């Protein structure tokens, strides 16, 4: 009977589009999963007249969902067991120490430091320990309305356990889903990168500067997605006996990395090329090809999520062929970088087209792993310069002061001050300031909207439905817009307390006050305790970026001299570290915009450095992207490439003046003009761009040090 019903539903015209919409949005899928678990736990209890039990289970499930990690099912089982133990310890400690406020405050502060440092050991532990801190605060909030002291240590971890079992059941039905979601996020992030980059073809100088800044910011998202893919792949590889089941996903990951290197490549300043009518015509075609490639990547991402096999777009193949044909008709200078650009796009197209070709297979690549033991990772955080230790101490002191204010002033539900501190306080000043406004705005909107709707829906059933709708919308918006998600978590809490004690509406004004106090404490703690002003970090970040760029360029030259046989792990690590260092510089520049005025004096200079370093990395990426097809012709170029590497390494140490760079640029120009063959001339053009960008970065870095001293 049930099978026939399912078959009838599948035959409906709306079923397939609905299925695709459902599976192609990971945030929506997560929201439905969490809301279903909360509904299963809360609805029977609330409707049967036991709202405290239902709401406590729901809060436990909420904490469990927020602390869930992307693991192989076996890893998820270990994570769930650890989570339930930590949640029980946290809630049990709160109930035992609740009659002794001084001990509870001290215990809260010390346990917060411990949990955050354990979370720094790895991604799996980070989620569990965050959830343990969160559920402990939930236990503090619910202590006054609990029928007995033993209920919360049972119900809150129990809710997390039941949610975890429900999530595990769904994961066993689709065991590869976390990996597919992370890969899909990576392809979508890269598709957006290509869409932005297409605006450079063609462009003027102002557009070039504006778009390069946006590309640097989008690159942060792409590299973060690649890192998450690597972590999840590592989790799956640790849980499997062999690599064979993982091979399709490893191939997708390697393709994503290769496409990213090609997309990040720059062959010349495109505003200069856009001035030539013939080149402009080809650049317009390159821009259209990039847009077609971004569409293909979105198709790839949707296929990973929905299970629909990837079909290479015919329009992309046609566009690439037309562009190649137009280039053949165009008379270009021997040193024009446009053939490299067109070849780069063609190889990206070929890589995507061969994705499903079973004949195109390589060995299973190794993945970068942290060689340190768990204890060594923990111990490495125990120094005063470690950002995570500083954040843990800030947060624990923030908790301690917030809890003291709550106790000394006998505030109703003053524990919300502590809860606000947890969500607002971030490791950086700029991150905290951003969260502060988002939290306050979201809470105010949630209170106004929530109180209005609770008055319209006075019944238990109506408020239960409103609570579940709030849970769904909270998870659906959590990764998209934090302010919007805060609105719905506020209405969720309002409904929850209204169901338990009919106090949700009366507690909303105190909740606003607690939010303001908690946000203020978070702001003061990050402002006064080890404020990590970005302008002061810029010289160190620039030094690290140049160091990693030099290592990446050195790895490229090693590939030209002696290609890797099968697995190029060392090359991939060098490339990834260069992008991470570039991202750190980009985020520092972005963070400066939220810092106090006197700390923003070097913001324009910081933007120029960020822009130039990202351009330098793009030129290096271009030299690396062509290492396979141009290796044979690189013999006469390698000596100059070695000198360019020496310039990069000297710039890293700060010991190179402008003259040596100028001499190298002059020599590259002379060699390029004296070379007849097109490939070496194109390579020399790339080397010239690398050396020129290095010299510009070095010149600006001297001005940056001067600005820093004045500040």
Describe these PLM feature segments.
Residues 1-35, 39, 43, 47, ...:
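Long, hydrophobic alpha-helical segments that serve as membrane-spanning/inserting helices
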Residues 5, 17-30, 47-49, 70-81, ...:
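Short, amphipathic, aromatic/basic-enriched membrane-interface segments that mark the entry/exit
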Residues 15-32, 36-150:
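Helix-loop-helix transmembrane hairpins and adjacent membrane-interface loops
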Residues 28-36, 77-85, 105-110, 149-157, ...:
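Hydrophobic alpha-helical transmembrane segments
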Residues 39-47, 88-96, 113-117, 136-140, ...:
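Alpha-helical transmembrane segments of multipass membrane proteins
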Residues 48-49, 371-472, 491:
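Core alpha-helical transmembrane segments of integral membrane proteins
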Residues 127, 131-152, 494-511, 529:
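Transmembrane helix-loop junctions at the membrane interface of multipass transporters and ion channels
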Residues 452-593, 597-601, 610:
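Generic detector of multi-pass transmembrane helix bundles and their immediately adjacent loops
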């Amino acid at each position: 009977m049930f099978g026939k019903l399912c078959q009838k539903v599948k035959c409906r015209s709306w079923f397939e589009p609905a299925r695709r919409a459902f599976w192609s949005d990971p945030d929506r899928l997560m929201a439905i999963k969490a809301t279903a678990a909360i509904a299963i736990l809360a609805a029977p209890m609330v409707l049967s007249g036991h709202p405290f039990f239902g709401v406590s289970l729901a809060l436990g499930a909420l904490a469990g969902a927020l602390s869930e990690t992307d693991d192989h099912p076996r890893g998820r089982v270990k994570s769930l067991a650890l989570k339930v133990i930590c949640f029980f310890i946290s809630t049990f400690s709160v109930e035992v120490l609740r009659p002794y406020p001084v001990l509870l405050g001290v215990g809260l502060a010390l346990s917060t430091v411990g949990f955050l440092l354990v979370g720094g050991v790895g991604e799996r532990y980070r989620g569990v320990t965050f959830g343990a801190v969160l559920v402990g605060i939930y236990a503090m909030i619910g202590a006054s309305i609990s029928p007995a002291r033993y209920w919360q240590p049972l119900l809150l971890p129990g809710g997390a356990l039941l949610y975890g079992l429900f999530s595990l059941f769904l994961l066993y039905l689709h065991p590869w889903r976390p990996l597919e979601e992370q890969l899909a996020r990576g392809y979508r992030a890269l598709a957006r990168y290509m869409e932005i980059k297409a605006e450079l073809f063609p462009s003027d100088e102002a557009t070039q500067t504006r778009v390069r800044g946006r590309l640097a910011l989008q690159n942060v998202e792409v590299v973060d997605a690649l890192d998450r893919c690597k972590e999840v792949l590592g989790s799956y590889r640790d849980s499997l006996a062999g690599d064979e089941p993982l091979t399709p996903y490893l191939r997708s990951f390697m393709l994503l990395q290769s496409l990213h290197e090609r997309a990040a490549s720059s062959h010349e300043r495109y505003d200069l090329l856009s001035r030539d009518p013939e080149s402009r015509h080809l650049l317009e075609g390159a821009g259209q090809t990039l847009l077609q490639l971004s569409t293909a990547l979105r198709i790839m991402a949707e296929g990973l999520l929905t299970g629909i096999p990837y079909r290479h777009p015919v329009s992309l193949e046609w566009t690439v062929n037309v562009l190649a044909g137009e280039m053949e008709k165009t008379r270009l200078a021997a040193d024009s970088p446009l053939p490299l650009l067109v070849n780069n796009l063609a190889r990206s197209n070929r890589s995507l087209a061969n994705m499903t070709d079973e004949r195109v297979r390589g060995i299973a690549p190794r993945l970068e792993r942290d060689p340190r033991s768990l204890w060594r990772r923990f111990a490495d955080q125990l120094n005063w310069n470690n950002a995570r230790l500083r954040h843990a101490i800030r947060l624990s002191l923030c908790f301690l002061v917030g809890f003291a204010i709550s106790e000394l002033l006998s505030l109703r539900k003053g524990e919300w001050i502590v809860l606000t501190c947890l969500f607002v306080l971030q490791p950086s000043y700029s991150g905290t300031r951003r969260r502060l406004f988002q939290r306050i705005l979201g809470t105010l909107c949630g209170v106004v909207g929530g109180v209005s709707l609770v008055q319209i829906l006075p019944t238990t059933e109506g408020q239960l439905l409103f609570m579940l709708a709030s849970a769904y919308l909270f998870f659906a918006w959590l990764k998209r817009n934090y302010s919007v998600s805060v609105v719905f978590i506020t209405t969720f809490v309002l409904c929850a307390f209204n169901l338990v004690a009919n106090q949700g509406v009366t507690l909303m004004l105190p909740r606003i006050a607690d939010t303001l106090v908690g946000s203020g404490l978070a702001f003061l703690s990050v402002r006064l305790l080890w404020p990590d002003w970005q302008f002061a970090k810029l010289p160190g970040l620039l030094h690290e970026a140049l160091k990693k760029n030099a290592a990446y360029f050195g790895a490229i030259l090693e590939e030209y001299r002696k290609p890797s046989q099968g697995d190029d792990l060392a090359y991939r690590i060098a490339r990834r570290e260069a992008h991470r260092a570039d991202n750190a510089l980009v985020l520092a520049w972005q963070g400066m915009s939220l810092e106090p005025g006197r700390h923003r004096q070097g913001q324009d200079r910081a933007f120029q450095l960020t822009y130039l370093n990202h351009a330098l990395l793009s030129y290096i990426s271009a030299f690396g992207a062509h290492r396979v097809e141009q290796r044979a012709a690189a013999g006469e170029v390698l000596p100059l490439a070695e000198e360019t590497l020496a310039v990069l390494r000297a710039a890293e140490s700060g010991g190179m003046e402008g003259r040596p760079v100028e001499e190298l640029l002059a020599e590259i120009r002379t060699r390029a003009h004296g070379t007849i063959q097109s490939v070496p001339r194109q390579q020399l053009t790339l080397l010239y761009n690398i050396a020129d960008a290095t010299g510009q970065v070095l010149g600006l870095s001297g001005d940056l040090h001067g600005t820093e001293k004045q500040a």
